[in-house]
Structures are given as structure tokens and as C-alpha cells.
Amino acid sequence: MARRGDTMSIVIIGGNDRMICQYKKICKKYNCKAKVFTQMIPKLGNQIGSPDIVILFTNTVSHQMAYCAVAEAERNNAEIIRCHTSSGNALNGILEKVCGL
């Protein structure tokens, strides 16, 4: 896990396609670097990398994506945060707790 003041690496799995730019903007506000995957892509596990945190928006993610993301997070000892809603406010709340800004 990154120390306070360092840039945290976050992967967001699920959510809405039209919100990708907003998710990244919100993460930037909390000094976090974000990768966002709203749809299943080939070799998703390789694309995830080794983030500090994986956020799963469970309402908008396929089971296949969720299983792949959780497996990669566990393999890299990343924290997994599950959230049912995929709104910007939900992401703000998660990052507020994690980053403490």
C-alpha cells in the first residue's frame, strides 16, 4: 500500500462507460492513478497489473470480470473494495476513507 502523500494505484472494475473520465478525474483529485475497465477485455488479468486497491462496482460488473479481478488482486496482495453502486459519489466516499483527504 502506498504511503500518505504517495500516488496510489487504483483499478476500477465495472461502472458505466460514460463515467470513465469522471472516475479518473475523481481519482486524480485524491492523488491516485486509475485504470478503469467497464467491459471485459482479452487478458484482463495482465492489464490490471499490481495496484494498491481494486474497486469492484458489483452492480455493473460481469461475474467473469469480478472473478478475474479478485484473483489478480489476491495474487498481488491488493486491497479489494466492493461497492454496489457505480456513481461518482460512491467513488468519492471510497477514496475519502482510503486516502483520508
Task: Annotate each PLM feature.
Residues M8-N31:
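Short, charged N-terminal beta->alpha structural module
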Residues I13-G15, Q39, T85:
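Cofactor-binding loop segments of dinucleotide-utilizing enzymes, especially the Rossmann-like FAD-
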Residues C32-Q47:
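A short, well-structured beta->alpha microelement
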Residues E74-L101:
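Ser/Thr/Gly-rich flexible loops in soluble cytosolic domains mediating phosphotransfer, phosphorylation
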